[in-house]
């Protein structure tokens, strides 16, 4: 174990005597260097503060001049917090004496993590009331929110820490402050079921506001299934009759899909139906749908007590009612609407009803693409689920275990929607696509193409497939490390796209169809590797031969001046199958001489040859 690690471990474990020995013979500069260095992203002081070693903290500050504000990585409940200062770590862990010492030594009370979380927020999160009080007494700002706009009061409400919430309110915390998504502290109480805190907030004049999705605290409670909050708010003076009805109907939908309690759902739906008809002079009927939805098996919402009673004998119809109600009340843009449609589809798939699953998932995907930003993780998850489902169906079909077939139209429809997602992302120039999300979407598309190659099709269908792939390639999309689709097709890492296996990469079939549809075989990634370089790294001679036959330049070099041949594993059979001499021309040898001898050629030879020579740099 090196000295740096030994110093770090001693500080983390609170072994002051050992640390003193380790540093005894070191110069001031050496001590400073050892104490300031990070191990696993954290300084010795940060670890000492995290684990509450007061004597160690004071020794590091007073004897070693450790920097009191330098942040680092700390782990809480399995989550790594980046950029956490020592005061934040001590506050989160509940070490009051360490917090007091750090502040006495000049620590900034409002110094934040990378996500803009303050020490006060950290103490509020885990319910450390005495630390909260001490920080506030030392001028901690109650209103500093994290990157999501979530305040100390909000997190106290969400975590159910009533005494802390009360203390913050007494100290003047803004009870109606909104997060980035428009949530208030009342929403946090509703989502966590903290009824007592909600009552207290209302005493401090909290307002029933809607969030960014148009959700009131009452609807938030209905979505999360907190009946105590729903019962309380449906009797609140600020709640209208229509809001009460919607809340009860939505709560019933939650009982169906989240709690899996059909009788409980009926109880709340009956309450809502009785409210609709309670005033015979002013019956509140459900809106008449303009069209019936095929994915919901053309179900209609029940509109009378008699129709509601009829649902008892048809559990499947009840589940469709839940989806209809949720879409009507929350709208298509709310994440829960598409989430539970997908959930219901997955349940159908588990029971072998793949047709119902595909119809529901397609409907959810259309909803997501119409309402979410391009390459949203939720949309990517839907596309991946389709790829995994189709792969499973094709495997079981091949084994003769499954009667249902995967049709070309099903697969092609999802490929088209996947390409549409890339088009949407590339058109959004003001906000460039996240490379990791784009890489995932590109990988999913390649898996879908791979699956399509296993499905029989007509000449017209084959033409449409290649036309779509051509359109996809013309978008010139790039993934991680600036990989083109062809780079991804020849890389083994493309195999790992989700939890379940879909297709195996490198894929000769996918590579072949990409080339046939116009993929550039000499395209470069950020390390100047061509697809041939990546195929060589993956030791796939068949793909290398295909790329070379299709015009890939064999002795082109990458950023590290390596050819594809240099990257082949000598132990692999590929070395024997790819003979450099068979693919090296006199023109290549001349270009190498020019590059190796640094002969100035720009402007002295035709532009086309300049490009050729540059391939050999």
From Swiss-Prot:
Record-stated family: Belongs to the fem-1 family.
GO biological process: proteasome-mediated ubiquitin-dependent protein catabolic process; protein ubiquitination; ubiquitin-dependent protein catabolic process via the C-end degron rule pathway
Annotated tissue distribution: Widely expressed. Expressed at higher level in testis.
Additional notes on this entry: Insertion of the beta Geo promoter trap into the Fem1c gene is the cause of ROSA3 mice. Adult ROSA3 mice exhibit widespread expression of the trap gene in epithelial cells found in most organs. Although normal processing of the Fem1c transcript is disrupted in homozygous ROSA3 mice, some tissues show low levels of a partially processed transcript containing exons 2 and 3, which contain the entire coding region of Fem1c. ROSA3 mice show no adverse effects in their sexual development or fertility or in the attenuation of neuronal cell death.
Pathway(s) served: Protein modification; protein ubiquitination
Protein's gene: Fem1c
Record protein name field: Protein fem-1 homolog C
Intervals holding TPR repeats: 245-279, 338-371
GO cellular component, one term: Cul2-RING ubiquitin ligase complex
Entry keyword set: Acetylation, ANK repeat, Repeat, TPR repeat, Ubl conjugation pathway
Classification via InterPro entries: Ankyrin_rpt, Ankyrin_rpt-contain_sf, TPR-like_helical_dom_sf
